[in-house]
Regions:
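An intracellular "coupling" helix at the cytosolic face of ABC transporter transmembrane type-1 domains
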Residues: 37-40, 135-136, 154-161, 165, ...
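Hydrophobic alpha-helical transmembrane bundles that constitute the permease/transmembrane domains
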Residues: 51-59, 94-105, 157-160, 164-176, ...
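Short intracellular "coupling" helices and adjacent cytoplasmic loop segments at the cytosolic face
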Residues: 12-19, 116, 124-148, 152-154, ...
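Juxtamembrane helix-loop junctions of ABC transporter transmembrane domains
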Residues: 17-25, 48-49, 56-72, 96-143, ...
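Membrane-integrated ABC transporters
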Residues: 1-57, 72-93, 107-111, 115, ...
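Transmembrane helices of ABC transporter permease
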Residues: 38, 42-55, 96, 102, ...
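ABC-type nucleotide-binding domain
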Residues: 79, 362-639
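Helix-loop-helix
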Residues: 74, 181-195, 265, 269-340, ...
Length: 639
C-alpha cells in the first residue's frame, strides 16, 4: 500500500493548495442566499426576537439608574421607607427580563429549524449534483475527501448558522443600542470604554489572522485523513496478505499527526481569544468604575451613583458582544473554509449531454412500420427527430462501429490511436493485451464515461454523441471490473438492473446467470439482506449477482470488463454457461482473461500501447504466431 506521503490529498477544487479562503464575502452571501431562499419569514422573525432581546437587556441596565437614584438612595434617607413603589418597579423590570428570555428562546428555537433545514437542502443539492458529475471526477478525487465535504464541511456550517450568525447580529444590535445608551448616561465614560474596546479589537484581529489560516489547513488535513482511512478500509485484505499492518499504521499516524498539529495551531490561537478579551473587559470595567466614582464624588457632569451603576452594567453588556464577535469570527472563518469546498464541488461542471436521439418501446403497425408504444414490448427503437419536424424510428440492433478513434484521459497524452473495429449484432468481440493496452478504455468510450477526441463511434449507424447518454447506457448491459452490491436484499440488487422488473423476471435473470442455485441456499433466499458491498458473499457469488443484474436489463449490447478474472475454475464454468446464454443474440464486448472466453469469440482484438496490432478468430491468430500466440502460449495458457 502507499505510504502516507503518497496518499492523494485534496486538489485545488477540494480545498487543496489554496492558502486562504477566496472571496469570503461572496461565500457568506451565497450561504445567506441559500438560507433566505427557503426561510426568509423565519429569519425576519429571528431578527425581531434578537432586537427584542437586545433592547430588553439594555432597558434592564438603564433601569439600574432609576432604581438607585429614585428608589434606593431616597429610601436610605427615610426612617420608614415605603417599599410598594420599589416592588412595582421591580415587577416592571422583571417583566422586561421575561420578555427578553422568551425572545432569546424563540430565536434559538427558530434558528435550529432554519439551520437543519438549510443543511438538509445543501446535502440534497450536493448529492443531486454529485449524481450529475462525470465519471472522471470520481476517478480524480479521493472518495474519502468527497465524503469529508458531506460530513465535516457541512457540519461546520451548522454552528455558524445556528450560533455564530445570530450571535453576530445580536452583538451588532446590542453594541449599537448600548453605545447610544452609554452616550446618554456619560460621554466621558463612553470615551474611556471605547479606548479599551479599540485595544480589544486590535488583539482579536491579530489572533483571528493567525487562527484563520490554520483552520483552513485543519480542514485540508481532515480530508486527507478521511481519504487514507477509506483507502485502507477498501484495501484491508491486501494489507493483511502482504502483512503491511504496521506500514498502514505508520501512514495513518503521519496524517493523524498532521491533523493534530494543524488543529492545535488553529485552536491554540482561537482559545486564547476569550481569556484575553475577558481580561481586557475586566480592565475596562475597573477603569470605568474608578473614573465613574471620581466623577460621582466630584459631581462632574451631573454624574450620580445611579449613573455609575447603570454605566458599569452597560459596560459589561458592551464588552461581552465585542468578545463574542471575536470568538464567533473563528467559527465563521472555519465555516467559510468548509463552504468553499462545498460550493466548489457544487460548481463542478455537470456531465454534458448534447444528445437528442432517445430509446423507446416500439412495435410494428399493420403496415409493418415501426412505431412508438408506451407498453413494454421487448422491441426497442431509436427515436430520431429531424430538423424538418419529422421523426424516424430505427430498430435497436446492437451494431457498434469505431472509426479512426483517438482518445486520451488528458489532452496531451493519447492512449488510444486510430482504433477501427466493429461489432455486428450477435457477435462476441474479445479484447486481449497486456495491462494498460487500452482494453477498459475502449469499453469506457462505448458507454460515454469519457468522450473521444477524434474519430467516430456509431451505434446502429447513429453517432453516439447524438444519443442521449441515459438512453445509450440503458441499452447496454455492463458487468464492471469491480463488482459493487448495494445494501438491500438479493432481489433488490438484481432488480437494480431494471427497476420495474417483476420478481419472476429477476429470478429468471438469476437462473440465466446460474446464480439461482446459490441464492436458494442463502438463509432467506432472494430476501437475504446484503450489507457492506455484499461482504457475506464470495467473490464468485458477487459476480454472478452482477451478471444477473445485467441480464434482467435484457440489453442488446453487453460489456464485460474482466467479469471472470477473479473466480475459481468451478465457478467460472457456472458463470461461463450463464454468460453464453446471456450473450446469445447480443453484441458482446469482453475484456478476456480466460481461455474459454477467448476461444469461442467471433473476433479477437489484440491491443498493444493503445493500438490494434492483430485481429481475427482464435485459429487465425494462432496461425499468425504473433502477439496473440505469445499471450496464448504464455499468460492466457497459465490462466
Amino acid at each position: 500500500m502507499a505510504q502516507a506521503k503518497e496518499v492523494r490529498g485534496p486538489g485545488p477544487r477540494m480545498g487543496g493548495p489554496h492558502p486562504k479562503v477566496e472571496n469570503p464575502g461572496k461565500l457568506l452571501k451565497r450561504i445567506m442566499d441559500e438560507v433566505f431562499r427557503h426561510y426568509l419569514p423565519h429569519c425576519i422573525l429571528v431578527l425581531v426576537c434578537i432586537v427584542v432581546s437586545a433592547l430588553a437587556n439594555v432597558q434592564a441596565s438603564l433601569f439600574l439608574k432609576t432604581l438607585m437614584d429614585d428608589y434606593i438612595v431616597p429610601m436610605t434617607q427615610q426612617q420608614d421607607p415605603d417599599f410598594a413603589p420599589l416592588a412595582a418597579a421591580l415587577l416592571r423590570v422583571g417583566i422586561i427580563y421575561v420578555i427578553g428570555i422568551l425572545a432569546a428562546w424563540g430565536n434559538a428555537r427558530i434558528m435550529v429549524n432554519v439551520t437543519q433545514g438549510t443543511l438538509r437542502n445543501l446535502r440534497t443539492q450536493l448529492f443531486t449534483h454529485m449524481e450529475s458529475l462525470p465519471i472522471k471526477y470520481f476517478d480524480q478525487h479521493p472518495h474519502g475527501d468527497i465524503m469529508s465535504v458531506y460530513t465535516n464541511d457541512v457540519d461546520t456550517l451548522r454552528q455558524m448558522l445556528s450560533q455564530s450568525i445570530p450571535q453576530l447580529v445580536s452583538s451588532a444590535i446590542t453594541i449599537v443600542s448600548v453605545f447610544f445608551s452609554m452616550c446618554m448616561l456619560s460621554w466621558q465614560l463612553t470615551i474611556v470604554t471605547m479606548l479599551m474596546v479599540a485595544l480589544m479589537m486590535f488583539c482579536s484581529k491579530k489572533i483571528t489572522q493567525q487562527s484563520g489560516k490554520y483552520f483552513i489547513q485543519q480542514q485540508r488535513d481532515l480530508g486527507k485523513l478521511n481519504g487514507y482511512i477509506e483507502e485502507m478500509m477498501e484495501g484491508q485484505k491486501v494489507v493483511k496478505v502482504f502483512t503491511h499492518e504496521q506500514k498502514a499504521l505508520d501512514g495513518f499516524r503521519q496524517l493523524n499527526d498532521q491533523l493534530k498539529d494543524s488543529a492545535n495551531k488553529a485552536n491554540s490561537f482561537a482559545n486564547i481569544m476569550m481569556p484575553v478579551n475577558a481580561q481586557l473587559g475586566n480592565i475596562s470595567y475597573a477603569v470605568c468604575a474608578l473614573a465613574g466614582a471620581a466623577m460621582a464624588v466630584s459631581g462632574m457632569g451631573g454624574t450620580t451613583l445611579g449613573t455609575v451603576v447603570a454605566f458599569l452594567s452597560l459596560n459589561k453588556s458592551f464588552n461581552m458582544p465585542i468578545s463574542q464577535v471575536s470568538m464567533q469570527a473563528n467559527s465563521v472563518i472555519m465555516a467559510l473554509a468548509g463552504a468553499e469546498r462545498i460550493f466548489k464541488m457544487m460548481d463542478e461542471p455537470s456531465e454534458t449531454d448534447e444528445g437528442y436521439v432517445t430509446l423507446v418501446n416500439a412495435r410494428y403497425d399493420h403496415d409493418d412500420n415501426l412505431v412508438e408504444t408506451p407498453e413494454r414490448t421487448g422491441l426497442w427503437a431509436w427515436k430520431h427527430p429531424h430538423h424538418d419536424g419529422t421523426t424516424t424510428y430505427h430498430k435497436l440492433a446492437g451494431d457498434i462501429t469505431f472509426t479512426d478513434v483517438d482518445f486520451g484521459y488528458v489532452p496531451e497524452k493519447t492512449v488510444l490511436h486510430g482504433i477501427n473495429l466493429y461489432g455486428r449484432p450477435g457477435q462476441k468481440i474479445a479484447f486481449v493485451g497486456s495491462t494498460g493496452a487500452g482494453k477498459t478504455t475502449i469499453t469506457n468510450l462505448i458507454n460515454r464515461f469519457y468522450d473521444i477526441q477524434d474519430g467516430k463511434i456509431r451505434y446502429d449507424g447513429i453517432n453516439i454523441h447524438k444519443i442521449k447518454k441515459a438512453d445509450l447506457r440503458r441499452s447496454l448491459g455492463i458487468v464492471l471490473q469491480d463488482t459493487h452490491l448495494f445494501t438491500g436484499t438479493v432481489m433488490e440488487n438484481i432488480r437494480y438492473g431494471r427497476l420495474d422488473a417483476t420478481d419472476e423476471e429477476c429470478i429468471a435473470a438469476a437462473r440465466l446467470a446460474n446464480a439461482d442455485s446459490f441464492i436458494k441456499r442463502l438463509p432467506e433466499g432472494y430476501n437475504t439482506m446484503l450489507t457492506g458491498d455484499g461482504a457475506n458473499l464470495s467473490q464468485g457469488q458477487r459476480q454472478l449477482l452482477a451478471i444477473a443484474r445485467a441480464a434482467v436489463a435484457d440489453p442488446p449490447v453487453l460489456i464485460l470488463d474482466e467479469a471472470t478474472s477473479s473466480i475459481d475454475t468451478r465457478t467460472e464454468a457456472l458463470v461461463q454457461r450463464g454468460m453464453d446464454g446471456l450473450m446469445y443474440g447480443r453484441t458482446s464486448f469482453v475484456i478476456a482473461h480466460r481461455l474459454s472466453t477467448v476461444r469461442n469469440a467471433d473476433c479477437i482484438v489484440v491491443l498493444e500501447q493503445g493500438r490494434i496490432i492483430e485481429r481475427g478468430s482464435h485459429d487465425e491468430l494462432i496461425a499468425k504466431k504473433g502477439k496473440y500466440y505469445q499471450l496464448y502460449t504464455g499468460n492466457l495458457a497459465e490462466n
